Every structure is written in C-alpha cells, then in structure tokens.
Amino acid sequence: MSLGNIPQAVGEPDGDEHPLSNPWCTAATKPVPQKISRFASPESMLAPMGDSPAVPITIRNTWKAVVDHARRYQDFTYVYPVISRRSRGLSIGVNLNPDTQCNFDCVYCEVDRTTPGKARDVRLDQVRDELRWLIDHALSGGLGLEAKFNDAPPEVSRIVRDVAFSGDGEPTMVSNFDECVEVVANVLREKGLSETKIVLITDSAGLDKVSVRRGVSLMDAHHGEVWAKLDAGTEEYYRHINRSSVRFDRILSNLLETARVRPIVIQSLFLKTHGQPMSSIELEAYCGRLNQIRDGGGTLREVHAYTLARPTPEAWATRLSAEELSAVAETIRAQTGLRVEEFP
C-alpha cells in the first residue's frame, strides 16, 4: 500500500468554526516533515504522543480535507480519510460500495450513477489491512503531512474520531454487513481504540435486513451510532428528492424500529429545488415524522440539519444560505423539541 511523496508545506486555516474535543485519544507534537518511501510502513514514522490540547481545536470549512470528501485514497479500495464537521475531526470512511450500488438516486448526490456499477463481494481481509494501515499512518502523523491534510493542525489528523460506513452507495446493501462491522471492531480493539465510535451512515432502507440488524447490534457494543437519512415528510417529496423505488413507509418503519432499540441520529439535507426551498407544509410534515418516531417509542439523539456542500448532478438543486438553514433548524426545534445541529 503506497504513501507516495508527502508534501511539507503547512497552510493557514480559515473559515467557519466547529469545536473539536478529545475525550479519548492524545494529540502529538508537530511531526518533522519527511519524504516517505512508497514501501515504507507507517510504524517507521511513529512519533511520541503528547497531552490533549487544552484549547479545543476548530474545524474550518475551507480546509482541503473538509471540502474534498473523495472516497479514493492511494491505491485502496475500501478505506479513505476525511475531516468531517459532523464527526468534528478525522473520520475514517469504509466504502463498502466501490461498485456505486445504491437504492437511492438523490438529486444532490455527487456520485456518478450514469454508468451502473457492477456488484461485488466485500473482501474482508482487504478492509482489515487497509484500515490497519491507515490508522497507523494517522496516529504516526504521516497523514497530516499529505497535501490534502497539511492545512489543518497536525493533531486533527492524528485523532481518529470515528470509523464510518459511508461511501459511494448504501452500506446496508452488502450481504455481509455484520462481518464488516466485526472486522472494524477487531481492528479498533487491536489498535487500542476500543472507545472510538463506529458509525453507520444510511438511507435506512436496509435496516430491517437480518445481517444489518446483527451488525448494528454489534456496533451497539462498540460505541456505535446510526446516522439515518430523512429528507422528506411526504411520499411525494421523498420521490422528488431521493428518487427511490423503496416505499417511504418502509423507511419510516425502519427508522422507528431501529430507534426503539438504541438512540439514533437523523441526518437531513435541506435544499432549494428550482429556486424554492422546502415548503412550510412539507417541513411541518417532516417534523411530524420525527414526532411519530418519538411517540412510537423511538429515541432520537439529535438532528443533523445540513445543506449542499459540493456540486450536484442536477443544476436545479441548490444550497440554502446559512440564514435559511438556521430558520429551518429553528422550526424543527420548535415543533419537536429535539436538539438540532446546523451544518451550513
């Protein structure tokens, strides 16, 4: 697995701020820039880890690894690093769908689905090896020296905030999701990161599958979190935005049943279509769905309200301003009483 040549420059960060706390891992002293052989192991770069920073780090919208969430890293197939505002730092993604298989075709998704991908089985040994290597590379300080990450403080890319099943499609579509979770949990334990979260970012369509239920139960034992999509309040708007053949009532049922077992996070993208934001009637219906989940015995940890951050395949799908997103979030708070985090 290759490292390539690591750039040495460190830029000045700027942009919106989000707090980064460090409850588990320790930060490092600034590593000495160096060029790494293509065949070097990250263990050869291990540097001593220092105390956690006393002042919280901020995640800035303009950092390259925040702007660019490409699911391709080096010559890997499954594993990739990003700096995530929602994770508040380094998130290691596990892309179980390099074939781009998905049961949604959201108007805002940047994944190219004009040429359908070819389904293939997930190679668990390769997931394990890629994840081991990338964790070592991050903890050693090597990741922070790469061009995509060198405009952020070094400690940001040395603290693994979570490992997230997320990528070019829907993670729950694979047949062995539970085995994938087991691989990730074992690697985290092996690397001394047993307290690090395992996150499933999902459109919720597959949460009723037996292997997925087993996998999510295993996540529960390893500080797992389910971040589940809900972008609509009505079937009509759901079809318009998510463009899926999966019935909307199945999505709602899966959300409810999953939230009855453990608290879940709702992730909702709000946007304009043909210049118009979600109508007040649709937003009220959306809030009603959240209340139905809670009234039905489900627990919602919080809502992540966000808008477009990257180019979309549909020119008529455009982002909300920060003020418009805040107004949406305030309506959700008022109508549901839930905690809502905004990511403009």
Where are the predicted features?
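Auxiliary Fe-S-binding modules of radical SAM enzymes
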Residues: 1-2, 7, 11, 18-25, ...
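N-terminal [4Fe-4S]-dependent radical SAM core
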Residues: 46-99, 105-107, 113-121, 126-129, ...
